[in-house]
Amino acid sequence: MRTEQPKVIHLKDYQAADYLIDETHLKFELFEDHSLVHAELKLRRNPERGAGLPPLLLHGQQLELLALELDGQALGADDYQLDDEQLGVQPRQAEFVLRSTVRIHPESNTALEGLYKSGKMFCTQCEAEGFRKITYYLDRPDVMSRFTTTVSAEQQRYPVLLSNGNPVASGSEGNGRHWATWEDPFKKPAYLFALVAGDLWCVEDSFRTMSQRDVALRIYVEPENIDKVQHAMDSLKKSMRWDEEVYGREYDLDIFMIVAVNDFNMGAMENKGLNIFNSSCVLARAETATDAAHQRVEGVVAHEYFHNWSGNRVTCRDWFQLSLKEGFTVFRDSEFSADMNSRTVKRVEDVAFLRTNQFAEDAGPMAHPVRPDSFIEISNFYTLTVYEKGSEVVRMIHTLLGAEGFRKGSDLYFQRHDGQAVTCDDFVKAMEDANGVDLTQFKRWYSQSGTPRLAVEGEYDAAARRYTLTVRQSCPPTPGQPSKEPFVIPLELGLLDGQGHELPLRLEGEAVAQGGNRVLAVTEAEQRFVFVEVPEQPLPSLLRGFSAPVKLSFPYSRDQLLFLMQHDSDGFNRWEAGQQLSVQVLQELIGQHQRGEQLVLDPRLIEAYRTLLADEALDQAMVAEMLSLPSEAYLTEISEVADVDAIHASREFARQRIGEALFEPLWQRYQANRKISRDTAYLAEASHIARRSLQNIALSYLSLSGREEILAACLEQYEGCDNMTERLTALAVLVNSGFEAEKGKALAMFADYFKDDPLVMDQWFSVQAGSPLPGGLERVQALMQHPAFTLKNPNKVRALIGAFANQNLVNFHRPDGAGYRFLADQVIVLNALNPQIASRLLVPLTRWRKYDEARQALMRGELERILASGELSSDVYEVVSKSLA
């Protein structure tokens, strides 16, 4: 903790390490009230750094140094320099061995970085800079070493002892203790180190690789969760096969392990051979996990497995290059999920998330490029920009080069850089070299922050049969970047005739048309694209598949959007047309509300939804997505000044009117789908998930009628279903309804039945935290006293406080500022307990400039109170100070 201003680290100051560590030998002695770490490091002067022997400066925090030896000679206090951040030693020769022993306290480590206790087990989290809390080391990603790790602990409490690589030896020490040694043959940076010790059960399977090697697959969990891992195991085997088929990447160790941990700051961690997962990303079975949770497990298992190549075999030179591994791997996992499920639905989900959350980040005080220029605390840059926008940047390269060209580029990247720590530029260079293209201008996506705008206009010349698209790009100022150079923006499009068919696309100067769908490269501030031989006035279908992470504007009328919603051959753009239509209609309602007029819903939206409900051929998951109105958070993001109350009232009014007007078709679809759900055993497969998603959105609309038959249907679904997806939706409908007696009974029944399952209780907290009914803050404050809640568990904090501040906008933003005060209070407490979680919880307050003057003053006041609250962690200080700048 610190009160002085923390140091800013800049990309431009990067220098390679003075020394390299060839071998790392660690021995851990784990006890209940402390642990001892013995390290033996074989170091040498880095030849890239020239001659001479500068001091060796090792990172280390919260370590008690007990012994230090250089080349076998004990060092006294006068022989080294020690402060809170590092240990300095003067080497006497270019190659040397340093041995140290430190005492650490995992049992009291609430920050969950380094080595810590989660419940009864020991585990680690070293990315980004947690290893320095374990032992003195060069804790930076460009120092890669071969690790051998021995773990010693009490045998009865900790029968399972795990680390990276392959197990090579184990034995008993007597006095009730035992040990195990693990050896990882691959060089890795310290952030990929892992250790687990606990009383764990294991589900084991195997996988035969494309070169016919058998790999043992093991998932370790606490005994009560042994029946919740089959889905994760199936997902792992699918992702191993997919990575071989799509990228030619084969697994390289004899064993692959996953461990589920309840107390974890992130989703999961790709440590070499020993992935450590937040239990929420690995445990799933029908009765306890929703469809969304099953899909999250599948996606996260794949993401961490894919890191074995895109992250571990080829890693980052420095943390500014984080998107090198994360953007690429998010792209890989989203493509995997698209192949396993519905590609269009996956794209819709990803884009809705990106536009609501990452676009807001890009428009706020924490805006930064995909490759940031500077940071105070690296854990603040595990962001939507680095991950999700970074993935979109990789996707654009894929779009521009095509699948075959992209694969050539990724093959060259892995071949050229295996075993190295490299940069985003190295990734792009491999793509360029493999395809003979120049991506110099494209690289602005890595260095410029903010969301580009694309303004498009169309003009048809009937006599000449020419259609001209004028495209203008711009990008608003962001912190530290007042003006931007033009990006390379892949604009995928089609032109539709009056029947909704694609017209052949031939640009001026081309001899022949190139099909009905193509990608234009927008590279200038203003460009014209002239299509020839266009027989009639076309309607453009623009930015198909969301081919670039930009804000697009085109002057569509509502009738044109209705036409695209029904006829566009691009599934994503059908959804997008519906979203834009809904936005126009909702913004009209918001204006009426602000002027105190009676609210009138455009009947065209209802008719569009009626047509959707009648379309039995359309994928039910797409029907469900298209029936979902834009969220309050998205409506906030696209507002100049967000009127929280008008947005909430208008959206609720629209939902109410849709539910009333379409009661019959919604009721028909609901009953038909619920009957199949009743008669069919649960499967987490695309068609079943689609059926339940339409069934559940229908129920949520129907519930707004307040009719007794809907209450009965809701209770039947709640009590009579065999899966959490249906049960949780029914519970949420009751919680948001006026049926007080039934609501109270259902909540009590749920909590009583699932009280011993922490992940299910997280869902119970979230359903209540997200309810927009009056009194939301008081409900959340009461729930914080519930025995299942603790501030020390990040999942609980996210489920209750995070859900309230991020999803329950009408209650969080109540005019008296009590919601802001509550959030600031929690951030101040968490700053001392777990700085990473505290800084993430802060995000809603950082968006204070979005709101009316009264709310701005209240939100700003809470940020200032946090800043003045005493010893702030660098995590919280950076976010608060940038938000107030």
Model-derived features: where do they sit?
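Short acidic/polar inter-strand loop motif in beta-rich domains
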Residues: 104-111, 476-477, 546-552
